[in-house]
């Protein structure tokens, strides 16, 4: 029914992905710091791909192979719900445009839609997690976490949205690299986007 090769997880044996996930959970529990463990997991695309591969073999493939999911009615319903979600999110952005500056709670709308889109493409469309997608995910998850922890966008994140710089911790809005002489240089990703 399922293959031993995980296209997203990148492991060659069927039992390696669940054992690796269990080892990660045990290491986090042994370290006593859930925050440090989650930061370690969310900072590596390889680890995220491993977790996505495990989730695909345990949850996504059985759902895809079910008769209900393969029915035309279910597929049309999911397509309509997805379109309604995107349209509702965009409509809320335009309707509450003036509120975005006054009330940061409305920033949850694009963050939630972006997270859903990234999860759907990674889990259902057989796309691997790249460093760029992981950085975008961390930014959006950072906005959600920052808004939901105390209701204020004040960079009080404990898990998502922080990168270590020379002496402080800041939100990873635009990745800036150092050229060794103290002059900030844009990352290759931002440079590539700027050229387009």
Curated annotation (Swiss-Prot):
| Top-rank taxon, per record | Bacteria
Asked if the Swiss-Prot or TrEMBL record annotates the protein with the keyword Cell membrane, the reply is: no
Give the membrane topology: Multi-pass membrane protein
UniProt KW keywords: Membrane, Transmembrane, Transmembrane helix
Annotated GO CC locations: outer membrane
Name the principal localization, coarsely classed. membrane
Entry's localization field: Membrane
Q: Where are the transmembrane segments?
A: 34-54, 76-96, 105-125
Write down the InterPro entries for this protein, in alphabetical order: CRPA (IPR008436)
The molecule here is called Sulfur-rich protein
Specify the species. Chlamydia pneumoniae
């Amino acid at each position: 029914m399922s293959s031993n090769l995980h296209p997203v997880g990148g492991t060659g044996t069927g039992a390696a992905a669940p054992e690796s996930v269990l080892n990660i959970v045990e290491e986090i529990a042994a370290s006593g710091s859930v925050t440090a463990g989650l930061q370690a997991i969310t900072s590596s695309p390889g680890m995220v791909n491993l977790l996505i591969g495990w989730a695909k073999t345990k949850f996504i493939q059985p759902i895809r192979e079910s008769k209900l999911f393969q029915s035309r009615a279910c597929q049309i319903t999911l397509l309509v719900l997805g379109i309604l979600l995107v349209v509702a999110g965009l409509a809320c952005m335009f309707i509450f445009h003036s509120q975005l500056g006054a009330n940061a709670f409305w920033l949850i709308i694009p963050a939630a839609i972006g997270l859903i889109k990234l999860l759907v493409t990674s889990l259902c469309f057989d796309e691997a997690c790249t460093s760029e997608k992981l950085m975008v995910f961390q930014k959006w998850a950072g906005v959600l976490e920052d808004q939901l922890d105390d209701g204020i966008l004040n960079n009080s994140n404990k898990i998502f949205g922080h990168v270590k710089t020379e002496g402080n911790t800041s939100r990873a809005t635009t990745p800036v690299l150092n050229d060794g002489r103290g002059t900030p240089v844009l990352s290759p990703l931002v440079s590539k986007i700027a050229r387009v």
